[in-house]
Amino acid sequence: MTPAPNMPASSFAQKARDFVDRLWNADDKTLRWILGALVVVLACFNFVRDLDNPAHAFWDESYYLTTTQRYEEGKAQYASHPPLGFMFMDAGIKTGKMFGINKNVDTHFLGDVKKIDSRVVPKGYDFTPIRMPSALFAVISALLFYLIILRLNGEAFEAFVFSLLFVFENAYIVHFRAAHLDSYQFTFTLGSILVWLYTFGREPKRPLLTYAAFGLLCGLSFMVKVNSLVMFLLGALSLGRALWLDHSRPNWLRQFWRGSSIAGAFLAVVTLIFTLHVVFNPNAPDTKTKAGARDNGAMGQVYKDYLAHKRDLSPAVVWDATVGYYKYMKYDFTGEVKTEPNGSQPVLWPFMAKAITYRWDFDGKKTAYTHMLGNPINWGLGLVGIAAAAVLISRRRFDRKETPDAEARTVDFDRLEALFAMFMVFWVFHIYLGIHRVMYIYHYFIGLALSYLLAALCFRILARQIPLVNRHRFSILCGLSVLIAASYLFYAPLTYHQYMTKTECNWRNIPVTLVVCQPAKKKPAALPAKPSPSLNKS
């Protein structure tokens, strides 16, 4: 029988439907692996490609290029943040040189100052090595985000769709593809949330190891940026809930040892990182340079004696170096400005206030932007998640009727309340910080992730309570994934430093202004003769 002319098209459509049907009806374990791998592939494509664009330092890279140069030379130093993130950057640079990248580029002068002008970069410098570790950590974060939602909702396809909130989040992409610290902090924070889910409302198989893993991940996150300390609240919620349900003396003793394992692991990793920082940088700072003079002024005598080879490495040396590091960070914090044109009010962060243009370049006809703008669809869903969580938690207090799925419903609501409490504490804590120093929208990244988790969990609860939502769950999830991806693609030129005309830029300002389209002036600012001093933005 001769096939009709349109048979190939219909055959392809049928094959596509069959594939989707097999995927949807695959056994749960297979589907989890397939979709988890797809999340990693998408994250690699979004975060790891074209890392040398723009081929200029932007935002805090102006600080971190100088910090990593001193790491490369093994010079003792202090910074505005703990040392772990800089160690990862240094590892990326050294790995790059193993492959010949930047091997013949003279970068020595970068270590003489604490900050360079973003346009004063060695000729031929490739940014891929210093940015690669951050991008790879972002890929790990994508997988962790998928696993967290899988743990919350228990369904692979649902976890995959909501993990797109991370994979296609333009704000995460533009910031995590750069040589910034936030990707490392974010990865360890997500790891701590995943481990916490194995402790909250259930008995772990190896409780002391599980709680210790939570403390270790909190410690790693803290050793990138200190505001991660607020995540300890999750561990406190697990311990507090266990004590609330069982007041017996044996249970108090169990929770004491679990809390001790959290604290012990945290202190162990902090001690280890500071020890490595001392060991990796055995050379005294060059006091003839601005950076060296500033670092030397913050160092204690015991640490100076070690650097001068007058004493061996010992706990006293590590302690003195750590105390000096703390004093340096504290001084930097108290010296922060409280307002700045790119700064934002933490109370407005859930509304994406406000985006930052890290850099723009004009070629005479078109302009390329590195613009820290979020995916509006994602942020809208995050805002819905926060509001829905507040409403559902309030209704729970008045809705005590028994249902066939009462046990699963209780677990979902307990997790929702814990995550909502964590979000509120994180948000209020940063509102408080905003009184004392300038804050930026990327400081909200952990809170944004928590809002996405709230949205995913609220969807699960609503699907269980509302039959209409449950019947059309697949269609709703497919529609969400299309909207998320389409919004990401629309704003991608601002994310990836792609050249656009001013008209194309203005399209991104409909219906509200999200980016100031450049050039606003005909001539760019002149290159300064020497780096201009500035306060740390991080």
What label would you give each PLM region?
Residues 101-117, 121, 145-168, 203-209:
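Transmembrane-helix signature of polytopic, membrane-embedded enzymes
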Residues 1-46, 161, 255-269, 412-417, ...:
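Start-transfer (signal-anchor) and selected internal transmembrane alpha helices
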Residues 2-3, 9-13, 17, 237, ...:
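Transmembrane helical bundles and short interhelical boundary loops of multi-pass, membrane-embedded
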Residues 37, 41, 117-120, 124, ...:
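Transmembrane-helix motifs of polytopic, lipid-linked glycan transferases
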Residues 58-59, 171-185, 224-227:
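Short acidic/glycine- and proline-prone juxtamembrane loop motifs at membrane-interface regions
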Residues 150-153, 192-210, 221, 240-249:
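Membrane-interface transmembrane helices that cradle and orient dolichyl/undecaprenyl
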Residues 40-43, 162-167, 174, 194, ...:
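Short helix- or helix-capping micro-motifs
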Residues 66, 73-135, 338-343, 350, ...:
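Interfacial juxtamembrane loops and adjacent helix segments
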